[in-house]
Amino acid sequence: MVQNIAILGASGYTGAELVRLIATHPAMRIVALSGDRKAGMAMSEVFPFLRHLDLPRLQKIEEIDFSSVDLAFCALPHATSQAVIAGLPRDLKVVDLSADFRLRDPAAYETWYGKPHAAPELQKEAVYGLTEFYRDEIRGARLVAGTGCNAATGQYAIRPLIEAGVIDLDDILIDLKAGVSGAGRSLKENLLHAELSEGTHAYSAGGRHRHLGEFDQEFSKIAGRPVQVRFTPHLTPMNRGILANVYVKGDPQAVHRALTERYLTETFLEVLPFGALPSTRDIRGSNYVHIGVIGDRVPGCAMVVAVLDNLCKGSSGQAIQNANLMLGLDEAAGLGLAPVFP
């Protein structure tokens, strides 16, 4: 049976990525698209690359009839999703791609996002959407919170190592490079071509990046005690992709073995042979994650390198993977597209 889908916030990058992926999904049909500032426009006017698809026109959220919608993807900006989702029908399944429901503790949300949560009752209901680690909870969920793209990349590299007890929990460093599409589609001076090209820079350094809240929450939960990592992201002049270099104290072979065993049966995660390192070019446009492990010149230390596409596995692809579970579909449905190369 085909499931009817609404995409709220379809005029942004993650919304367009949802449309691109669902276009070839065997069991999903897009019946509504919202884009309040572009209401009335065709998606092909906003994103010409979608011109060949037969899609509904963009409309305001309040104009959508949700009575025939099975699941809604909410690709609205952070701090906007809270009020919108609170106003949706209570029996409607929702996958949220914003940061609004990722942190379970209302106090933690206020710490990292600077204001109280507008829908704390939904915050407690939401299931964290790192699919490979929360499958059972996601299957029975009404509201799933998509992870941060940087947070997902780091967790894929580190979670199995904490679970296996093969690293020092007090010495974890994440050095991450991210593509510019992760900053969204709105006009910003620092994202202009002349400002961004031919250079790279750290941002939200010194423990200020909001995805640290997700690392704290998830790693501490696994370890059963507080775990804090050092994390610095860098903006790089590429459209898509994230590369995380994760430095840990632990035997490199044990680190590689723990990751290999944990992801052995996972469709979208591949651990490369020991010593081989991944590249963002090899996962571009796909829902795949590649992970490599190498030893360090310092004995007893290892580096884990993880790459994913921030718009796909880091956001919209992950959202569809979660929606598949929520709707009782094949988890990998619609997500088998090969990476784009070159």
Swiss-Prot record:
The keyword tRNA processing does not apply. SMART domains: Semialdhyde_dh. One of its GO terms (cellular component) is cytoplasm. It is found in: Cytoplasm. Its EC number is 1.2.1.38. GO terms for molecular function: N-acetyl-gamma-glutamyl-phosphate reductase activity; NAD binding; NADP+ binding. The active site is at residue 149. Pathway: Amino-acid biosynthesis; L-arginine biosynthesis; N(2)-acetyl-L-ornithine from L-glutamate: step 3/4. It catalyses: N-acetyl-L-glutamate 5-semialdehyde + phosphate + NADP(+) = N-acetyl-L-glutamyl 5-phosphate + NADPH + H(+). Catalyzes the NADPH-dependent reduction of N-acetyl-5-glutamyl phosphate to yield N-acetyl-L-glutamate 5-semialdehyde. PANTHER family: N-ACETYL-GAMMA-GLUTAMYL-PHOSPHATE REDUCTASE, CHLOROPLASTIC-RELATED (PTHR32338:SF10), N-ACETYL-GAMMA-GLUTAMYL-PHOSPHATE REDUCTASE, CHLOROPLASTIC-RELATED-RELATED (PTHR32338). This is N-acetyl-gamma-glutamyl-phosphate reductase. The gene is argC.
